Amino acid sequence: MFFGNSLPFNPEQDIPSLAGKVILVTGANIGLGKQCVLEYARHQPSLIWLVARTLDKAQTTVNEIHQQLDVKNTPPIKPLAMDLSSLSSVTTAARTIVAESPRLDILMLNAGIMAAPPGLTNEGYELQFGTNYIGHALFTKLLLPVLEKTAAIPDADVRIISLSSHGHVYAPKEGVLFDTLRTDAESLGAYGRYGQSKLAIILWTRQMARKYPQFTLASIHPGVVRTNLMNNATGSPWVIRVLGMVANKVVTPVDQGVKNQLWASVAREVKSGEYYEPVGIGGPQTPKGEDDALGLKVWEWTEKELQGYE
């Protein structure tokens, strides 16, 4: 499914040569993340980091991609383990990149969970907020040395693309309830917790764009895409889960649904800090997505929480 006024985008034709570039994709063992790696690999970057929750999952996907593409013409793809619900795992993964990667041109923050049951991350954050938002915020923060070094290279074009969702409209009316972020936030419901995490991504992206003008950042909604995200939405009411599985038969296939994030990672028209519906349609669907006072509060809260991981 695509939206009115969607921009035309053909990954095969519209992704330019990626020669010399290094790309990293989180949540890359399945769905949109795996499709991103496949599409990027066809344009010959110097290296792709394929990140999954476990090294076995990452390596299995690397092997699958090598089987799907002509191995002789496939760029190096390195598997990397990172569990976003564990900030120690995030820290370890980021240190590996900083130590081993000479540059980083595209950072695709693709991984996430949806409508999970109430729970906490290893460090005690609400599970969806911690996984979808905090883990990626820390990962990006720790990668700043290599991102800034890359941005200083002549003609470099550093992109940081975050998967948000149209589901940010389900966030609480206040936007982000800070007193729930170190609880399981059961009272918000599965989709309230999900919406809160996805709204935070939009707000963080806007703040990052202001503070790091040398990068191009965007948050995106991929559309309603045929992935296993809804199958794992075990915290959602059973009726919604069933409808989601039925909808999976008719919604956008992954090779089409991936277009918005790929577009955001290469297109010249991207406005840094913007949120995009597919493909290339700008603007949050709720006023809270453009609330810069709330965004600054989210930024300051996040910076305080992540002190000590630098």
Task: Give each language-model segment a name.
Residues 42, 99, 265-269, 307:
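Residues at helix-coil transition
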Residues 167, 283-286:
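Short active-site-adjacent structural elements
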Residues 2-231:
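Rossmann-fold NAD(P)H-dependent dehydrogenase/reductase core
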Residues 72, 183-184, 236-246:
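A short C-terminal helix-loop "cap" of Rossmann-like NAD(P)-dependent dehydrogenase/epimerase domains
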